[in-house]
Amino acid sequence: MELAKILEDNTFSQDSLEGIRVHRIQYFKKSNKLKVIVKSKKEVNNNQITEIKKVFFKKFQYFKEIEVLSYRDVSGINLKDICEKYWIDIVNSILTYIPFCKECLISSKRKVIDENTLKLQYGNDFLYNILKEKNFEKILSSTIKDVFGVECKVKFILDKSNGKCNYLDFKEEQEALIIKNIIKESRIEKTIPKKDNNYNKREENKNSSIIVGKNINEDPVDISNIDETSGIISICGDVFKTKIIETKTGRKIVTFYITDYTSSITVKLFPKPKDTERVIEEIKEGLYCKIRGEVVNDSYAREIVIMARDIVKLNKIEKMDIAEEKRVELHLHTKMSAMDGMNSAESLIKRAAKWGHKAVAITDHGVVQAYPEAMEAAKKYNIKIIYGVEGYLVDDGIPIAINAGHRTLEDSYVVFDIETTGFSNKNDKIIEIGAVKIKEGKVVDKYSTFVNPERIIPEKIIELTGIHDYMVKDAPKIEEVLPKFIDFIEDSILVAHNANFDVSFIKKNCKDFGIHFNNPILDTIPLCKFLYPELKRYKLNVVAKHLGIPLLNHHRAVEDAKTTGDILLKAFEDLKDKEIMNLNMLNEEYFKNQDIKKSPTYHVIILVKNKIGLKNLYKLISESHLNHFYKKPRMPKSLINKYREGLMIGSACEAGQVYKEVLMDKSKEELKEVISFYDYLEIQPIKNNYFMIRNGIVKDEEELRDINKKIYNLAEENNMPVVATCDVHFLDKKDEVFRKILMAGQGFSDAENQPPLYLRTTDEMLKEFEYLGKEKAYKAVVTNTVKIADSIDNIKPIPDETFPPKIEGSEEEVRKMTIEKAHSIYGEVLPEIVEKRLEKELNSIINNGYAVLYLIAHKLVDKSVQDGYLVGSRGSVGSSLVATMTDITEVNGLPPHYVCPGCKYNEFITDGSVSSGADLPDKNCPNCGVLLSKDGHDIPFETFLGFEGDKEPDIDLNFSGEYQAVVHKYTEVLFGEGKVFKAGTIGTIAEKTAYGFVKKYISEKDLNVRQAEIERLTLGCSGVKRTTGQHPGGIMVVPQDNEIFNFTPIQRPADDNDTDIITTHFDYHSISGRLLKLDILGHDDPTVLRMLQDLTGVDPKKIPLADPKVMSLFTSPKALGVNAEELKCEVGTYGLPEFGTKFVRQMLVDTQPNSFSDLVRISGLSHGTDVWLNNAQYYIKEGYTTLKDCIATRDDIMTYLIQKDLPPKIAFTIMEKVRKGKGLTEEHEAIMREHDVPGWYIESCKKIKYMFPKGHAVAYVMMAVRIAYFKVYYPTAYYATYFSVRASDFDAETVFKGEEAILNKIDEINSLGNNVTQKDKGLLTVLEICHEMNLRGIKFLKADLYKSNASKFLIEEEGIRIPLSAIQGVGENAAKNIVEAREEGEFISKEDLNKRGKATKTVIENLENHGCLRGLPESNQLSLFNL
């Protein structure tokens, strides 16, 4: 070998390499890398190393990379000399094995203890542990021996005197050393001539593509080939996730994931402080870049990462469609094809547009839920969308008996079965035929024979049938058998179970041998579906068992034919019972009562040609979901024909009817009949159907091509266009892995064998179909697809306009209600501030067409209040005074004010000294002496509708949870049946779920995958549709003069056939700007207040909002008669809505609120995202602001900026951007600074991700304060109500063990820390309130079989009686059954409880354990001992 020759003569011959010899060679198989170690008495320079590389590359061209390391060749050296003079050589050698430790080893303390022992001390515990893990002592000892021939022992010791160094400190130290080296290297580089200096500093500065470090010239390696030995390498790829970590010293570490689609890896970067913000800005998701860095083991991540030195932004060269005339894709799936399509509609449309395609179709499986996204993408990328669907076609026009005419049940029938070598009538052979002849209801003849297939029978067929080769080797061949079998049949009706399969073999063989065959055919599968609909499956053995017919030796033709004959005879008896006496009557009755849910489905492509077609498709989608859903939304052929106008029907893929019929080798006449339903036929790349080869359905690729050719010719012969499509399920070939993972997760055994269902260019498709001939391929790929695209109108699946419902006279009614209510409060002459506000609001509301929304909300609230349930408003509707005057909300947006309920005297506080009327001191009317009412929370109307009144209003209302269904039903009364639909939602795979799919896949495949690649795979699987649902309270309203199909199809949530709820097919967000959406939400607070009112007789509306005792609860529990120490809580807000959580309780402790307006601010702060933590909390703590002046609700921003003299419209725009988490533009930041807005305020705005409206916060606090009032003054009613409505995690067992058990359980849950579950959290809340209740002297009473309610906690003289459902293991339904049964009389035994009360054995045991069944005998039977 050449390598051996080099080693034999290991001194290089070139003069420039004189004295250099090869010391050792290492080959790394995984990365195909050669490492050459040379020795020389002189120092080997870079030019010589380059020459050595050339020598090896010349001789060994097949290595991907050759690395050369040089050592000094010295003799007569000892260990001390090595440590003092040649340590750097050792360090450089160690880098071969441990690439990241250079500077650390240089800075270590070295001491030679005796002649052959080296003691090495190092003070960085982080790196020390890594080096120990790497077996550093052995590597160092071996390296010294290899390089210098000196044997020694190494003792590596942690020097604790230097203190410990954590990971981040170590990284900062490393980064400082790197910077130092870069500076050092740059000084050296200045001496090199410019033309040889690839990293010249001036060139670097000019290169704007450099993000960090220097330019990178070497070729990148595949990320999949990187391992711990890789050292310093270059990679190239797409950044897909970033994370910024801030150290204690304020330095920032940039961590990001990068992929080249061979794998992915984590990259870490420590930018210079001056460059940090720029680097963070440039390293974003989607960046395509080249990186050079060192591969190191990260002990925190427990895997290798790259410590980046250089990062260069690159222009990505992407695949383009360069054909002069481009194709159009007419079969494409998005993420809305449930668990099947991998890419978003936008990404697919963006690619098609980028390639210059004039149009692209969207054809998801059975749904059209990608349309809204596609519509927006079409506008964005200026491309036509062809809206379509791949439906599930049911051919409901196929009779049970074909060509049977008026044949009677007494006629002659031949029931037969065949066994074959496989599934293909073209490639497989018959090996057995069995038949029985039936006439006048009796078996009159039999036929049975083996058939020699002239080939070996496959093993799986032998296993299935028991027919071996020796059994058929002497049997007659099919050409001998078939004429005899045809003679046996005569003109009988041919019968089989799944006749399509068996008859196809007979037809094919008759055709091959020129035998005429045209007998009537009856299939017993649809016959049994018609007669026995109660069955779920209709396999022969299942039907036989159901009818009590024996089936011996299943999968033998003779036995199967006999059993099928018996089934036919039983079916004939049942048909006669139905007075069906002939096959024509049978077909007629079958078509009348056909259950298409049990019929086979075919794929079909339906494209929308125009607006009429769009509406028809929406109707078709709706009916398929509402009336014909069984596993899939099925579309009967008759239904498609009913809505066919404006639609174009295509034959779809290999699962389509046309492909299947061609595969079955049907006659031309039969095929002509089948294709008459379609407008165009479809062919696809043969590799899409490779599974058919694997499964033995077709023989090879050539047969797949033949099928496509037949479909093409069939279309041409019938003057029908044929198109070539990709059947796109993912964007690029690399994306197939996501589909593999999801399919594997669903249990598909063939998930690994992914067909290439990616989007192809025109040239790729032309090459794919070149076997058709150049002209035909061009026609199918380009001409016909473009013609179809051109024949389709540009349409919008959702109209742009808004279509609010119309109520005659709504404008006048709203105005009248408003003014009348205002006069009733403020008097005949309205205060100017009220009059101006109402006039402005009414004009804005009426002029923009929103009066009807107000009127509807008023009617819904009025209905609830009349029925005794308060309604809480949500969102910013509390900003609208008109909403207050029309009784939609209790929140009054006027400035704080007094008003006399008698003489209407009023006084408004407009100087900003008070934020809420509730905080005003009590005051008597100066005119009539009565106590003045206090109101007003100072909320600008513009928060709701904007300064132009053009912001879409959103009125959210909190109804009692137990009353919500009544209100939903009432909307139908208001708008009419068929005009009200629940707001639909689409449930997609969340990242957490996707992560589970990925981890399962990796585990099952036993793959070793880095975290970055797991993250990439997780992101790729996220967002794929899984199911559908409904908004908890959203109702979409269609105007009387319109219909839902102009906006969306409709369906049931989660395709649940058992529910009466109908939802929009589109996610409600897609159409909420077009149709009115009412938010009729269920909430506990109104339910709680109703129950408290029922128990106490106190009207919640009359409760003062600033009662001193009540307000004190938010800073101390003293008003409850307990102290903070015994309660283990510094405030008294356990169980109060919005203020009972641990997080908000701590906020109360931190802020010490003393007013209603303080509570409003706390509510706003606690509900926002990044509003309190690391924001207002910090600025208050550091003294920049106070609770009263920080940013708490969205309204604060606009109000404050207007006070700072910013133009109102700009103030509103800034508020809207900030509240949605969009930060501030440079222009907005500049104008804020110009108006002296403080820096902390600007920074606070930039941190906010989401903000609560003040109107919402006020409404919540009003409810909380009212409930708190009952907690203080009516404690028993409060606790009974709380546990009845909110305590789903009540633990009766712990509660009745006593106070000590409760406190122990509280401590146990608190000790769980981050491991606490949601159930634990719920239980903790319940136990804390139980503890508080005990401290207040109120106790629980055990459940009683006759005294307890099913689900409500009842007040008794001695305490609160728990309900039956509060006992563990006794659910609410079981409790209700018992309560209903006891109304009929007491239970006489456990047996009676079981029968009348429907109590299961488990329920009875749990009731007994709780002590509810004392004295109740086991049985109804009396004995002497019972007397």
Curated annotation (Swiss-Prot):
PANTHER family: DNA POLYMERASE III POLC-TYPE, DNA POLYMERASE III SUBUNIT ALPHA. Its EC number is 2.7.7.7. It comes from Clostridium tetani (strain Massachusetts / E88). One of its GO terms (cellular component) is cytoplasm. Keywords: Cytoplasm, DNA replication, DNA-directed DNA polymerase, Exonuclease, Hydrolase, Nuclease, Nucleotidyltransferase, Transferase. Belongs to the DNA polymerase type-C family. PolC subfamily. SUPFAM superfamilies: AF1531-like (SSF160975), Nucleic acid-binding proteins (SSF50249), Ribonuclease H-like (SSF53098). This is DNA polymerase III PolC-type. InterPro entries: DNA_pol3_alpha_NTPase_dom, DNA_pol3_finger, DNA_PolC-like_N_II, DnaE2/DnaE/PolC, DNAPol_HHH, DnaQ, Exonuclease_RNaseT/DNA_pol3, NA-bd_OB-fold. It catalyses: DNA(n) + a 2'-deoxyribonucleoside 5'-triphosphate = DNA(n+1) + diphosphate. It is found in: Cytoplasm. Required for replicative DNA synthesis. This DNA polymerase also exhibits 3' to 5' exonuclease activity. It comes from the Bacteria. HAMAP family: DNApol_PolC. GO terms for molecular function: 3'-5' exonuclease activity; DNA binding; DNA-directed DNA polymerase activity. Coiled coil: none annotated. It holds the Pfam family RNase_T. Residues 413-568 form the Exonuclease domain. One of its GO terms (biological process) is DNA-templated DNA replication. It is an enzyme of class 2 (transferase). The keyword GTP-binding does not apply.
